[in-house]
Amino acid sequence: MASKSHDLTHGPLVQQIILFSLPLMATNVLQVLFNMSDVAVVGQFAGPEALGSVGSTSILVSLFTGFLIGMGSGINVVVARYIGARHDQDVHEAVHTSLILSLIVGVIIMALGFLFTPAMLSMLGTKPVLMAGAVSYLRIYCLGMPAMAVFNFGNAVLSAAGDTKKPLYFLSMAGVINILLNLFFVIVCHLAAAGVALASIISQYISAALVILSLRRSGSVVRLERSMLRIEPHKARQVLSLSIPAGLQNAIFAIANLFIQAGVNSFDELMVEGNAAAANADALVYDVMAAIYTACSSFMSQNYGAGKRKRIIHSYFISMVFSFGIALVMSALLVIFGRQFLGIFTNVEEVAQAGMIRLRIMGCSYAFSAFMDCTIAANRGLGKSFVPTVIVIMGSCVFRIIWVYTVFAYFHTIESLYLLYIVSWAITAAEMICLRRVYREQMQKLPPDIDGVKATA
């Protein structure tokens, strides 16, 4: 079967990266908005206690979903590289192997999350008044992990093939259903936090079904065929060697944030609720930037498979500038219109005041995460994940934990807690040094004049 996938190895890079990223941004923003609808509906119609219950689970939700998103990014790189190299049989094997692996991981996370929810929430120091609602919300949410794993698999495969529009359509359909179910379960059925969790998992299974149906009907090289559903050992090793470190990188952020959440929980309930409301901005900014990182990884991987040196490194720099600039604009808007933003989630003035503290500090910090995250995506696009993972562990996990137990413990102000983000991003910008070495090593593996630029030693 000839590949009918979108070619990312020819044409004007700036235009291509922008056009590739925009549907991904819309997809990610819609996902964030639908997640925000959970918080908004709970905050407006179920009260501050239910809002705090949902907010208390946010770090654990990020831990589980972050690992699955990382799995997807590894799948994206492997599939994109084979598409770029025009190795259709390898694409088939990678796609079908990845689907089975994703399902297995999703089921494992579901089981572990469901069983250990009370213990994990207790470790975070969740307030007793919020515990029952938090346990109910998180356990129900965990039942949707297999569906989320499948959707992330499909999103990764379609993006690797250059199609970023279909996931947007699927998520839009599932998201509208999610909002309607949120309102029904909370307002009509009075299920509070459990209601929005139930709405979420129903919409997740709908989006997973849509993406699988699309791949089954696809006329391109990424078509799913029942007869090919098996784990091919070599492809499994390739996928896991990138997916597990990528998943761990995302999970490590969440693990470090567990300690940060414990720090937030040491303040009163108003601060916890304000933090929960303001933290929605994190997802909004990060997920818009993440669309560009996916573009960076996809373009670099396809062009590496095709042996296009200049396009590989240019993809990185264009993505870096693009993500930094967008973060600056979004940060400015959040700081200027912060009170209006927080008003979506709470009508309690004291909660909004607490949330503004986080928005102001994080608004000055978001853009600097591009140096780390875009470089992580670039390393992954070149097939290297181990060293970036070590750097992230040291800079974003170990350092943040040390900060919580030293700087924050000494000052014990919410400002001293939030400032650790920008400092840790500065440290993990050392990823850029790692990329230079990885790039030089990988370029030596390509034929010397494949794109008209002689390889450098």
Show which residues each predicted segment covers.
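Interfacial/gating helices of multi-pass transporter permease domains
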Residues: 42-62, 128-133, 193-194, 198, ...
